[in-house]
Amino acid sequence: RHHARTHPAFYVTYSKNTVLRDIMLYHCTGMAVIAQFDENLTMERFDIRIHPVKKRVFTVTADGFHCIYCKGQILIKDCFLENQLDDPVNIHGIYGRIHKVLSDSEVLVELVEGMQKGVPLGKSGETFGVINNETMLDVSAEVLAEHKMLNRDYQYMRFAKPVKGLQEGFVVENKDYAPDVLVEGCTFQNNRARGLLLTSAGEVIVRDNTFRSAGAAILIEGDSNYWFESGATKSILLEKNRFIDCAYVPDWGEAPIQVSPSAKKYEDGVRYHKYLEIRDNDFYCFDDRLVSAQNIEEICMYGNRIHKTDSFEPIPGEKMKLEGVLRVTDKPHR
């Protein structure tokens, strides 16, 4: 990292119906937008661009739009993001790790990842998933009866009824925050790392965008052992996008589209992510790689076009690298 992420341009928290429109941002020493526990958030014609006169080679020193535990709809429309020092968009929740089981309805929960310290995971009345950290599949869904922040590392949770099979090491996730996402008409280019990081259980649509990403243009992940970023997806549609010479830095992506949750232990007939549809996109590729995916139930691909380029030396790899994928079809659910 270039230096400490000291000052985001916008910090939006516990808000509703926030619109950031017609904004030109040249630089900030942090993320452009941090949004947390918000309902209905719009970034429209919000550009992050290199200054036309100054000689600075990067724009913001971290992510563009970083949304944590939001709900309702996140709309990102007609935006232009370039030259950030991290991903343009990251949408996710937070897994809290069960540090200690106090009773069959009480747990001490730890925030493990350093940048999540001090974040309250929810409040009484909200629904939490109790999740097996090895499979990352839900064990149960429970209503939170009581919540207390003990310090920046630990918080106390009491559920409304006893929970069978509570174990230390399992994780919890607030299920009330799972936004629908629409990303449309945007350009994402020339930044460090990846493109869109999408982990939300809402309806996710990515349509008519242009990607020039050093790593994966689309990364669908989720993990319970490092970043602790949550969000098993149910339905993601990638439609009419242009993926131009993406994934030329292997450390940041195995293919232009990558699905790679951290769980490597599977249960029969069930996967962490559910459905990904890739249709009518244009892939401009300097090698064969299109999709690298694991731990997802179904991928549907049809109507896509592949255009060969010679922009970079080819990187060895399969067109479709799959592990633990239950079905690949050309027949959409919609």
Regions found by a protein language model. Name each.
Residues 97-129:
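Surface beta-strand/loop "capping" patches
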Residues 1-3, 137-181, 189-190:
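Small/polar beta-strand repeat architecture
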Residues 4-15, 30-38, 65-68, 174-175, ...:
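Extracellular beta-strand-rich solenoid/capping regions of secreted or surface-exposed proteins
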